[in-house]
Amino acid sequence: MEQRKCSFCGELLEPGTGLLFAKRDGSTYYFCSSKCKGNFDLGRLPRRTVWTEQGRIYLKKA
């Protein structure tokens, strides 16, 4: 089975876990937790959030 990546934090998702969100235009988003989905819904940027993969790179916390 193929692994997915969380659309917000970048964490790998095991098959059968996480949340799937599909928009009407056909785009799909995968989330590892409700925390990631909530931040995505609020319009927060992953690169400005310290605990995300992009945030660690952008804020030099790697």
From Swiss-Prot:
SMART domains: TRASH. Gene3D superfamilies: Ribosomal protein L24e. Zn(2+) binds at C6, C9, C32, C36. Pfam families: Ribosomal_L24e. CDD domains: Ribosomal_L24e_L24. Binds 1 zinc ion per subunit. InterPro entries: L24e/L24_sf, Ribosomal_eL24-rel_arc, Ribosomal_eL24-rel_N, Ribosomal_eL24_CS, TRASH_dom. GO terms for molecular function: rRNA binding; structural constituent of ribosome; zinc ion binding. Its cofactor is Zn(2+). GO terms for cellular component: ribonucleoprotein complex; ribosome. GO terms for biological process: translation. Signal peptide: none annotated. The keyword RNA-binding applies. It comes from the Archaea. Keywords: Metal-binding, Ribonucleoprotein, Ribosomal protein, RNA-binding, rRNA-binding, Zinc, Zinc-finger. A zinc finger (C4-type) spans 6-36. Part of the 50S ribosomal subunit. Forms a cluster with proteins L3 and L14. Binds to the 23S rRNA. Belongs to the eukaryotic ribosomal protein eL24 family. This is Large ribosomal subunit protein eL24. The gene is rpl24e.
